[in-house]
Amino acid sequence: MLQPKKTKFRKQFKGRIHGTAKGGTDLNFGSYGLKALEPERVTARQIEAARRAITREMKRQGRVWIRIFPDVPVTQKPTEVRMGSGKGSPEYWAARVHPGRVMFEIDGVAEDIAREALRLGAAKLPVRTRFIQRIAD
């Protein structure tokens, strides 16, 4: 699963996801993509599950690009532990996804296969998404 090799600090503030995506809103690599429509934290496990669903539907043809990276450590305290005594330990990694952000791109397959593959991948994600495609020049 995806996670940073090294970070400056072990724990981060929770933060909020305000506004829309500043960058990464257009297709850069592939012909088809999956764009987020709402703000949400997407975990590394969810990204991996979506990637597997997409590649399985494409039958290992074409190419998949993951345009988001889980760089936010999410902490959790153990179950049945009283409040207080500091912050919990990092449990998993998540990516903050803004509305308008392209999360996945694919290329090298037909449009109907791409549409179905991204639909199956979107089912694994906690955000509403939209299928986008490059405008033919």
From Swiss-Prot:
It holds the Pfam family Ribosomal_L16. One of its GO terms (biological process) is translation. CDD domains: Ribosomal_L16_L10e. GO terms for cellular component: cytosolic large ribosomal subunit. Keywords: Ribonucleoprotein, Ribosomal protein, RNA-binding, rRNA-binding, tRNA-binding. Gene3D superfamilies: Ribosomal protein L10e/L16. Signal peptide: none annotated. GO terms for molecular function: rRNA binding; structural constituent of ribosome; tRNA binding. Belongs to the universal ribosomal protein uL16 family. Part of the 50S ribosomal subunit. Binds 23S rRNA and is also seen to make contacts with the A and possibly P site tRNAs. This is Large ribosomal subunit protein uL16. It comes from Methylobacterium sp. (strain 4-46). The gene is rplP.
